[in-house]
Amino acid sequence: MRKLNAVIFAVLAVVFILPVVATVLLSFEHGLQGYSDLLFDCFVFYPMFWNSVIYAVVITLVQLVVIIPCAFGFSQARFRGKGALFVFYIVLMMMPLQVTILPNYIGLRDMGLIDHQLGIILPMVFSPFGVVVMHQYMKNIDNSVIEATRLETNSIIRVMITSVIPQLRVCIFAVVLFVFADCWNMVEQPMLFLKNEELKTLSVFITNAQNYTGEVLFPAAVMFLIPVLLLYLFFNDSLEKGLTLGDLS
């Protein structure tokens, strides 16, 4: 059985890794000329790359500010309807983007945020995924530390900052990786909510493949992969620990 599982996982690994390897190899089809054209002659690359960085970093940081208090409330607070509200969060997490993107567009249009950076950031701030994951992880934290801090202060914010967040470092790293990757890979939002090319992201650059030659496109795809791969390499241990502890709960 173990050998069968090993074979299955090996096949799946090859299926997932093969497109990445093919992209890297194709990026060197013309030697370094494609990278040279991309980095020195393609003037839209740098603005779109930094737009992707800014959107992903800002959304990730703001999501953490929202996620941690929400997850703390679900795990520690007692109020009527908490279970139903948490189920609602899970339903929202499973809801596909295509269901919510039109209401988001209408709301942003009415607020005058179409073709504005906030039109990308605001709809991504309130993500139920991080709340659900961090709530599961909070079931494993040491409540004795929280109770000891509550004896010293009545401030729930201080309790959260001094007693809860230090125990969430592993989970925070895991959530950061997932949220950053999700924001980095977003395509529909910048394509629909932004008209100004100077505000669009690198994912849009790659999606509009018909506008560029293969010499530039494949190197751009490799550059697009690098930030998420680096994050995974740095936070791999924290990601595995976070997923394991969340699964055990």
Say what each PLM segment does.
Residues 2-249:
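A structural signal for multi-pass alpha-helical bundles of membrane permease subunits
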